[in-house]
C-alpha cells in the first residue's frame, strides 16, 4: 500500500468506539472527505471491493465502479504530494474520470462530500517578484496557531525576533526576561519561569516552542487588505472563519504590510505557500471585495467570478454586506 494512503488510513480513519461519531463511510464525521476516500482506496487495494453505499449515488454498475477506483488508486499513488485537501482530491477524481458520465462523477464526489467540479476555484500559486507600491515592510511568520484565526479577515501571528523587521526593536527588558526565563527553566524553577513569561507576554512578545526549539517572537494582529468577510455573528461568518483557517492554519505566512488601521492591526497582503490568501478567499466566496479601502481591479474580478458561480456566501440571493451589518449593530 502506498505510504500516503497508509498514513491517512492510520491517522484519520481508525474506527471510533461510539456509533454516533461515525460518518456514512465508517469514519468520524470530521474525516469524511479526503481521508474517507483514502480509507476506501486502502480497502479496495486489499479486497477489490467498492463501498456498499456508493450505488445509491451513481448509475453505473459495480464493475464500472471498480474500474474507477482502480484508476483513482493508481493516480493517488503517483501524485506527489498526494491530495491533502477536499479541493485537491476532487480535482484528482474529476481529472481521472473526465471521460465518464457527469452524473456518475458528481455522484461519486457527493458520496464523499467533496466539492463538485463547477464549484472548484483556481488560485494563483506564486508570490510577487517585487514589492507592490505602498508596501512599508514585509516579514515571515511562524506557523499560525489555529486558535489565532479570529474570523475571515483577521488573524494573530507571531514573528521571530531574528527577523530583520523585528530584531532591532526588541525592548531590552524583553530580551533580559527571556534569558532569565531560560535559566529558571534549567533550574526547574517553573513558577519563576512562568512569571517571567507573563512579563514577556504583557510586552507583546511570547516564547514559542517550534520544532523543540524555544523562539522569542513578537505578536502582530493582521487585517487582510482589500477584503471584508462576514462577521462571526452574521450568516456565513463561521464558514468564512473556517475557510481562512483551512488556508493558513499551522502554516508560515509571508506578510506584506501597507500600514496600520484604527485598531492597531497591520493591514497587509498574505501569502501562504505562494498562494495569495485574499485571492483564495474571494474566489471561494468567503469574503467581499472591500472597495472603500482597496481599489485593485483584480479583487473586484475575483469577487465577480464567485458571484457568477454562486458559491460561498453568494449562494444567497442578497447577502448582507459586513459594513452594513456593523453599522446596524454598533456596540453601545
From Swiss-Prot:
- Enzyme Commission code: 3.1.31.-
Q: Which cofactor does it need?
A: Ca(2+)
**Which PROSITE patterns does this UniProt record tie to the protein?**
TNASE_3
Q: Which InterPro entries match?
A: SNase_OB-fold_sf, Staphylococal_nuclease_OB-fold
Entry keyword annotation includes Lipoprotein:
yes
List each copy of the TNase-like domain by range: 140-316
Q: Please state how the activity of this protein depends on pH.
A: Optimum pH is 7.0-8.0.
- Which biological process, per GO, is one annotated for this protein? DNA catabolic process
- A GO term, aspect molecular function: DNA endonuclease activity
Q: Which residues form the active site?
A: 223, 231, 265
> What is this protein's tissue specificity according to the annotation?
Expressed in leaves, stems and siliques.
Query: Where would one find coiled-coil regions in this protein?
Result: none
| One Gene Ontology cellular component | plasma membrane
The protein's enzyme class: hydrolase
Protein family (similarity comment): Belongs to the thermonuclease family.
| Protein name per the record | Staphylococcal-like nuclease CAN2
Q: Tell me what organism the protein belongs to.
A: Arabidopsis thaliana (Mouse-ear cress)
Amino acid at each position: 500500500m502506498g505510504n500516503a494512503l497508509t498514513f491517512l488510513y492510520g491517522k484519520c480513519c481508525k474506527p471510533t468506539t461510539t456509533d454516533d461519531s461515525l460518518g456514512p463511510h465508517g469514519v468520524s464525521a470530521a474525516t469524511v472527505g479526503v481521508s474517507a476516500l483514502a480509507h476506501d482506496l486502502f480497502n479496495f487495494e486489499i479486497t477489490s471491493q467498492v463501498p456498499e453505499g456508493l450505488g445509491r449515488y451513481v448509475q453505473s454498475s459495480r464493475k464500472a465502479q471498480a474500474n474507477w477506483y482502480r484508476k483513482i488508486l493508481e493516480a493517488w499513488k503517483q501524485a506527489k504530494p498526494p491530495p491533502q485537501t477536499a479541493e485537491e482530491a476532487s480535482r484528482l477524481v474529476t481529472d481521472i474520470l473526465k471521460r465518464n458520465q457527469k452524473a456518475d462523477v458528481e455522484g461519486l464526489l457527493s458520496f464523499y462530500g467533496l466539492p463538485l467540479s463547477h464549484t472548484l476555484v483556481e488560485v494563483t500559486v506564486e508570490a510577487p517578484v517585487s514589492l507592490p507600491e505602498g508596501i512599508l515592510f514585509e516579514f515571515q511568520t511562524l506557523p499560525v496557531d489555529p486558535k489565532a484565526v479570529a474570523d475571515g479577515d483577521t488573524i494573530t501571528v507571531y514573528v521571530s525576533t531574528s527577523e530583520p523587521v523585528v530584531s532591532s526593536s526588541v525592548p531590552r527588558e524583553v530580551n533580559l526576561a527571556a534569558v532569565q526565563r531560560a535559566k529558571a527553566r534549567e533550574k526547574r524553577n517553573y513558577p519563576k519561569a512562568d512569571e517571567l513569561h507573563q512579563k514577556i507576554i504583557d510586552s507583546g512578545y511570547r516564547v514559542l516552542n517550534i520544532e523543540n526549539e524555544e523562539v522569542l517572537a513578537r505578536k502582530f494582529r493582521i487585517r487582510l487588505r482589500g477584503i471584508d468577510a462576514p462577521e462571526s455573528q452574521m450568516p456565513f461568518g463561521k464558514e468564512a472563519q473556517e475557510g481562512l483557517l483551512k488556508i493558513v492554519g499551522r502554516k508560515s505566512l509571508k506578510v506584506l504590510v501597507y500600514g496600520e488601521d484604527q485598531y492597531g492591526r497591520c493591514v497587509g497582503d498574505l501569502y501562504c505557500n505562494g498562494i495569495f490568501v485574499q485571492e483564495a478567499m474571494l474566489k471561494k466566496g468567503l469574503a467581499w471585495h472591500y472597495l472603500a479601502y482597496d481599489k485593485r481591479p483584480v479583487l473586484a474580478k475575483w469577487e465577480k467570478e464567485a458571484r457568477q458561480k454562486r458559491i460561498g456566501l453568494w449562494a444567497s440571493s442578497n447577502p448582507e454586506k459586513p459594513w452594513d451589518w456593523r453599522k446596524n449593530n454598533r456596540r453601545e
